[in-house]
């Protein structure tokens, strides 16, 4: 794979939008590039977007490609994607949106509700944005996050798009799947730890620390949104494309996890 040298470009530090540190990213022309920081985030982004192309996902999602980045004498694995914002558009995270209209922190507000279904604040978002299918959108996001075990979904990477010219809101494509599938091998999920250890340690966000509790609450309110149409063979083929960039232990862990997830979420698997 071609190595892209970014020494001539200043990185934008991806801080404030993840709970796990400071990831290097670059905006060059109409593409974003992100360097792996915690482990195999690039592989995670690429694999999730590849597999979503074999699904009935009713909402748009960012498509990622693998990238190898050279910067300051170091080689990074990573990924790249097209900038999905058009002219006059800005991305508004729910945290910023909620603060703008209420003066309160959404993350703090969620902790005030004892019942998970009450924390899924769809009505408030729809009233502010005039988007009428936000509940279905949020449910699809939680289905993706539960299946791929995204530990980093929070009120700063659930977002809507605002057009400053028309002053209208629309749904954002799904993005930020880098910390799926135990990709953080530097801190929380070392590659020599068992799958059972990782499963016992991981916690969901933002409505519950349990993936299934928040998913069940959303699906009960808004119904099942996604059908996955890929096979385990598809997973192996997609992983093979990136096997030269990541250790065999990483590929084996992802295969093992996704085989388990296909069994656990069999109701989402569509032939």
Regions found by a protein language model. Give the residues of each.
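Short alpha-helical "patches" and their helix-cap loops
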Residues: 62-71, 154-164, 271
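Generic structural hydrophobic/aromatic packing signal, biased to beta-strands
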Residues: 28, 33, 64, 81, ...
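Conserved kinase catalytic-core segment
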Residues: 117-181
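Conserved ATP-binding subdomain of kinase catalytic cores across diverse folds
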Residues: 1-104
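Active-site-proximal structural scaffolding
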Residues: 41, 45, 137, 151-154, ...
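Short coil/loop linkers at secondary-structure junctions
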Residues: 58-59, 132, 178, 268
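ATP-dependent phospho-/nucleotidyl transfer catalytic cores
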Residues: 83-142, 245, 249-253, 264-265, ...
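C-terminal catalytic region of ATP-dependent kinase domains
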Residues: 36-37, 166-271
């Amino acid at each position: 794979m071609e190595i892209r040298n970014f020494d001539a470009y200043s990185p934008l530090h991806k801080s404030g939008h993840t709970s796990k540190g400071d990831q290097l990213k670059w905006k060059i022309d109409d593409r974003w590039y992100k360097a792996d920081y915690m482990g195999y985030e690039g592989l995670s982004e690429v694999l999730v977007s590849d597999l979503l192309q074999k699904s009935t996902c009713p909402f748009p999602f960012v498509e990622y490609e693998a990238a190898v980045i050279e910067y300051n004498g170091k080689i990074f694995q990573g990924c790249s994607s097209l900038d999905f914002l058009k002219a006059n558009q800005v991305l508004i995270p729910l945290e910023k949106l909620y603060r703008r209209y209420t003066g309160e922190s959404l993350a703090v507000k969620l902790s005030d509700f004892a019942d998970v279904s009450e924390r899924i604040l769809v009505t408030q978002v729809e009233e502010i944005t005039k988007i009428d299918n936000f509940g279905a959108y949020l449910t699809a996001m939680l289905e993706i996050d539960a299946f791929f075990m995204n530990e980093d979904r929070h009120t700063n990477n659930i977002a809507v798009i605002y057009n400053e010219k028309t002053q209208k809101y629309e749904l954002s494509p799904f993005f930020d799947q880098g910390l799926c599938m135990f990709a953080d091998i530097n801190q929380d999920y070392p590659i020599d730890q068992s799958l059972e250890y990782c499963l016992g340690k991981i916690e969901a966000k933002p409505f519950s620390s349990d993936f299934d509790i928040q998913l069940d609450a959303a699906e009960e309110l808004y119904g099942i949104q996604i059908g996955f149409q890929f096979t385990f063979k598809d997973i192996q083929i997609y992983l093979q494309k990136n096997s030269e960039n990541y250790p065999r232990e990483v590929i084996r862990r992802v295969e093992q996890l996704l085989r388990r997830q296909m069994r656990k979420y069999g109701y989402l698997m569509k032939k």
